[in-house]
């Protein structure tokens, strides 16, 4: 079981307020601040909010993750709040086939093949909130579905062979951008020169 939380608070830019005086007020009878701040942002992530990895006695592995993210930026120049949020769920399943024989010429190798399948759904959206006008507007967003399948075979401690297939389907919430699909597949051979 795993959990991680990260939060960052940033002040984009600030300058000394030349009109500042102790106990001074502005025209709306608000206290005057020592600094003029233009932008404040908060970035928080639960990456993962909760995650669980399990290895079963029959060489089966399962895992699932729930991730959350939120970025909030307050612009004090134009009184706008920009909020970007994202939610993701990842489900994974793997299996290790032990001592699988592979014949190369007159030599037989008995190594393991690790097969991994991951499926994820991520939803992102960006909302602009105009505070003085009391208007909220969705300006960006998407739903991303991803499938990743791979099989790894280790010939020895230096040589590894990997077959993979990745597919990502991106469906936007707004009609300003087009749905896209990306597919990657292939074979990779990794040879390690150093130990």
Model regions and ranges:
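Exposed, low-structure sequence patches enriched in small/polar residues
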Residues: 2-195
